[in-house]
Amino acid sequence: MEKIIKESKQGESLVLENKPENTKKLFIESYGCAMNFSDSEVVASILSDGGYNTTSVLEEADLVLVNTCSIRDKAEQTIRKRLEKYNAVKRTNPKMKVGVLGCMAERLKSQFLEEEKIVDLVVGPDAYKDLPNLLAEVEEGRDAINVILSKEETYGDISPVRLMSNGITALVSITRGCDNMCTFCVVPFTRGRERSREPQSIMAEIQDLWNKGFKEITLLGQNVDSYLWYGGGLKKDFVNASEMQKATAVDFEQLLEMVAAGFPKMRIRFSTSNPQDMHESILHVIAKYPNICKHIHLPVQSGSNRILKEMNRLHSREEYMALIDKIRAIVPDASISQDMIAGFPTETEEDHQDTLSLMEYVKYNFGYMYSYSERPGTLAGRKMKDDVEEATKARRLQEIVDLQQKHAWFRSEEFVGKTVEVLVEKVSKKSKDEFSGRNSQSITVVFPKENYKIGDFVNVKITSCTSGTLKGEALGLSSMN
């Protein structure tokens, strides 16, 4: 499971610089994980070349697309409500076309197109280059569908437009799909098997971002640490690669060092990591380069060995704790965040207490916590009874959230009195006189604007904090400028 992008970003319409020669209008919304938001940038780029300018006004759109998430039932219900809204607008504008992209497209294709007849086209995550052809089908009065999962597609040849309108931070996709087959997760079924993008196309995209003034990139994938380029194809087929392909293959450690060394004045983040793929050699690269951010998102899902086995997680509690110890030893200033699921099938009170005790051991900086939501098509959905009562799930989730809040306070207070480097990203929501940005550990920092500007790297002395935000005074520009 990849962490859901900030709630404030959910459903945000993507608006880009318009081309004067384009005559059609595209309204596109994104929900779910960062990969969906990155994919929407690819889609907007493809359709910009096809004559579409973006709009934030739903009612004036010729084409409405929603990039969807299937990770939890709540996400699907939110998107269904949006589809109802689109169709209400469509009744007054029959020429408007409505399409579903992403993970729900693959899972509910027949239901959307044939049974409910609420959309005109359904396009899976690997079929976005086919959008112009599919739209031509729709213009001819036919429904259009392409949800074929690819063994090769990485969109490495598409130059994405940028969702992050601050012009400072950007997402760079490096892998697609996942091979892990966790029993609760739909990603392998909706996004296909794991494959990696050619390193030079990644470097070229980052160079383009640097030339445009971007200051920070996030290397993105469902499982970035398992990145492996050996000339193309699925990761699982690497065993059949030639000796030359194996000798010249590039793994995540090498890619991360390549990016950090190639762009020393650009901040590098990455997400998401799976514990079994976070090798010690990667930690040494993180420690070696000051421009690699000292934050590791390390989903664990449960602290119980029995539940981890039921989830088909490829690590034990003890292996996870040993990895935490390595991180603390090699990258002592790293922040660590988590994903946690409360109420997985058969979870007992003892299992839940194991989760809480693991949290006490790690004391995460922040986390993404959910109650279990049965997803059709997953192994858990097919084979396991959702037998934990909703009230019990809610109570256990609240205990996890409360403990995380306690640890977040503890970790925030560790920064008070210290000086941190902050990349200014925007004006603070709470005060127009303050800037907001993040430090290397991905913690939000606010400080008075003074004469600084968005895009500056500023040294800030932390004077106070809340559980989620650090507050301080600027000391001057950092050496990253």
Predicted features, each with a name:
Residues M164-I168, C178-N180, I292, S302, ...:
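Short flexible coil/turn linkers enriched for glycine and charged/polar residues
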Residues M1-Y227, D251, E318-A329, Q353-Y361, ...:
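Proteins enriched for Cys/Gly/acidic motifs involved in redox and nucleic-acid/cofactor modification
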Residues E12, A380-N481:
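Terminal RNA-binding accessory module
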Residues V98-G102, R107, N211-E350, E360:
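Conserved SAM/AdoMet-binding glycine-rich loop
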Residues S30, E310, G367, F447-P448:
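Thr-Gly-centered strand-to-loop micro-motif
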Residues C182, I202, L219, F270, ...:
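Conserved, mostly hydrophobic/aromatic
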Residues E29, L101, L220-Q222, S271-S273, ...:
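Generic beta-strand/beta-sheet core signal
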Residues V186, G233-S242, G381-D386:
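Short glycine/proline- and charge-enriched loop/turn segments
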